[in-house]
Structure formats: C-alpha cells, structure tokens
C-alpha cells in the first residue's frame, strides 16, 4: 500500500513524528480528480457497497493479512488478549480486546481520560472550531447533533476529537464515571474518515452516520459522547447497558472495520483540557494518546 506521511505529536515522548497513511495514492485520486470525486461520492452513499466492504473484512482468507499488517505498522501484539492465530478474520483482529493491564486508567474523580487510542485535537472553546469550515461555512454543532436544544447546551462549551487510525486499538471506553443514557442514532452517509480526506472536507462529521450518548456526571455535568461511523454500514457497536452507572475506563463499545472517530462535547466551564493537548491543537497538530490517559480536569473557579 502506498503511504503519505503526516505529522503528529507522540504524547509519551513529546516528539513530532510521522504517521504512515494507508492507501494515500487511492485517496489522492478520490480527492484531487473530478472522476475520483464523483466515484467516491457514489460509493460512499451506496449502502450495498458499504455492506460488501464489511463482509469482505469478515472472510476467513483475510486472516492472512493480519501478520503483515502487524509487522508493517509495528503493532504491539503482546498487548492483545489473544494470540494472532486465534483471529478468524481481519475484522476479528481489528476489534481485538487487550489484556486488562494494557491501558492503565488515570485515577482521580476530577480527571477525565482519553476514551480511545488515537490522534487527538481539543478545543477549549467551540469558537476555536472556526479554523474548520465546511464549504466555507462554520462547523454546525446543530447539524452534527441533529437537535437544536442539545446543540444549545454545548454551543459555548468544549470539544475533543479522537481519530482512530486503522492500526489503533478499536474499542472505545467511558472517559468519566456516571449514568449513560441509551445511544441515539443519526442516520447518514458513510464517507471515509481518512486524515487526508478530513484535511479537505470536515463535512463528514455532519454527514456520516453517528450515535450520541449522554453521560451524566457529578464532576463534569452532561457529556455528549459521539461515535462517527465510516465506510462500513455496521461499524458502530455498543456493548454497555443503557441507563446504568458506568465506571471510568469501562468499555462502551467498538468500531468494526470502517468506524474511526470519537467526539466528546462538554458544557461550558466543565473541563480544563491538559495544557499539552491544548498547545499542540492550537498549532494544528494532533497528539497521539492511549486510552486511559488524562484528557483534562474538572473545571474549578
């Protein structure tokens, strides 16, 4: 697979590194040619195509892709709960569980943790989203949430985005403790959430299928937890019990092949994001984090 490099900050080392982008030549065709853009739009709006993509990744023959993928992207297989030969397909590996101690959870009731492995951008104020535009229009929180009243609650709040790359651990977790309501689904298209695509078009967040869960917490208020699906029609899977009390770090669900973004929304004066994440985000740099690390602290006046 051809690859193009993209810069990010490794949070553990503080160094700027290069992410190898999967299928960048194909993506370049889709975004830089008229024929490619037309074909891409048709394919991603076709539910049959999305189902075929998902079905292909569940075929047993795809298990032979696992070892080369692990080697190329230097995935730490020692963290996985099962050995490589136990995975029946590439999708089985994609949704793998980790050993219980593989992702320590940052302790403290006043600390919100990162919900997934991935590349993070944080926006202490929704006004900071002005650097993202959709067809020369500001990002619409109302369109994203599909609910004007809900959007109003977060309009002056804060936002964190976690982009999961294909080589990441693809189970997502609760960043705080609290009562988690039943997810609300917003149907939409299934455009790719590829980093090169996002640089050209942030619109996928308001067009793609997504699921919204409200978590009520004493420390952080009502937090909106949004999973954004992509490519594979059945990519978002919830594993928690709606209406129940959830612990910080507990598994919430997983993305099958194709789903790849988690967005957290906080009401005003509820969280202070960690300074390193804020600083790098202001420079337009994503920060690669592991699930369970500190995202921010409860706001205190």
Swiss-Prot record:
Cofactor(s), by name: pyruvate
Localization: Cell membrane
A Pfam family the protein falls into: PS_Dcarbxylase
Gene Ontology biological process: phosphatidylethanolamine biosynthetic process
Active site per UniProt: 117, 173, 260
Tree of life domain: Bacteria
Keywords: Cell membrane, Decarboxylase, Lipid biosynthesis, Lipid metabolism, Lyase, Membrane, Phospholipid biosynthesis, Phospholipid metabolism, Pyruvate, Zymogen
Record PTM: Is synthesized initially as an inactive proenzyme. Formation of the active enzyme involves a self-maturation process in which the active site pyruvoyl group is generated from an internal serine residue via an autocatalytic post-translational modification. Two non-identical subunits are generated from the proenzyme in this reaction, and the pyruvate is formed at the N-terminus of the alpha chain, which is derived from the carboxyl end of the proenzyme.
InterPro entries recorded: PS_Dcarbxylase (IPR003817), PSD-B (IPR033177), PSD_type2_pro (IPR033179)
Protein topology in the membrane: Peripheral membrane protein
A GO cellular component annotation in the UniProt record: plasma membrane
Cofactor binding note from Swiss-Prot or TrEMBL: Binds 1 pyruvoyl group covalently per subunit.
Gene Ontology MF term list: phosphatidylserine decarboxylase activity
Chemical reaction(s) catalysed: a 1,2-diacyl-sn-glycero-3-phospho-L-serine + H(+) = a 1,2-diacyl-sn-glycero-3-phosphoethanolamine + CO2
Subunit structure: Heterodimer of a large membrane-associated beta subunit and a small pyruvoyl-containing alpha subunit.
Homology family: Belongs to the phosphatidylserine decarboxylase family. PSD-B subfamily. Prokaryotic type II sub-subfamily.
Name of this chain's protein: Phosphatidylserine decarboxylase proenzyme
Provenance organism: Chlamydia trachomatis serovar D (strain ATCC VR-885 / DSM 19411 / UW-3/Cx)
Organism classification: Bacteria, Pseudomonadati, Chlamydiota, Chlamydiia, Chlamydiales
């Amino acid at each position: 697979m051809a690859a193009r490099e993209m810069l990010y900050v490794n949070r553990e080392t503080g160094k700027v590194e290069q992410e190898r982008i999967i299928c960048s030549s194909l993506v370049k065709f889709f975004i830089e040619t008229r024929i490619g853009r037309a074909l891409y739009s048709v394919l991603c709006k076709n539910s049959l195509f999305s189902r075929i993509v998902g079905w292909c990744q569940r075929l047993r023959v795809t298990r032979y892709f696992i070892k080369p993928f692990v080697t190329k992207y230097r995935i730490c297989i020692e963290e996985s709960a099962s050995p490589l030969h136990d995975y029946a397909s590439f999708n089985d590996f994609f949704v793998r569980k980790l050993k219980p101690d593989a992702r320590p959870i940052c302790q403290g009731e006043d600390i919100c943790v990162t919900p997934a492995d991935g590349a993070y951008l944080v926006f202490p104020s929704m006004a900071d989203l002005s650097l993202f535009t959709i067809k020369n229009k500001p990002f619409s929180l109302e369109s994203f949430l599909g609910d004007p009243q809900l959007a109003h609650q977060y309009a002056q709040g804060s936002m964190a985005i976690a982009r999961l790359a294909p080589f990441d651990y693809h189970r997502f977790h609760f960043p705080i403790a609290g009562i988690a309501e039943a997810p609300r689904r917003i149907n939409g298209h299934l455009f790719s959430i590829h980093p090169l695509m996002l640089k050209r078009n942030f619109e996928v967040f308001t067009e793609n299928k997504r699921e919204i869960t409200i978590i009520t917490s004493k420390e952080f208020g009502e937090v909106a937890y949004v999973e954004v699906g992509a490519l594979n029609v059945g990519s978002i899977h919830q594993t928690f019990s709606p209406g129940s009390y959830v612990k910080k770090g507990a598994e919430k669900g997983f993305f099958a092949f194709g789903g790849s973004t988690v967005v957290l929304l906080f009401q005003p004066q509820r969280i202070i994001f960690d300074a390193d994440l804020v600083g790098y985000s202001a420079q337009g740099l994503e920060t690669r984090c592991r699930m369970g690390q500190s995202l921010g602290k409860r706001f205190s006046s």
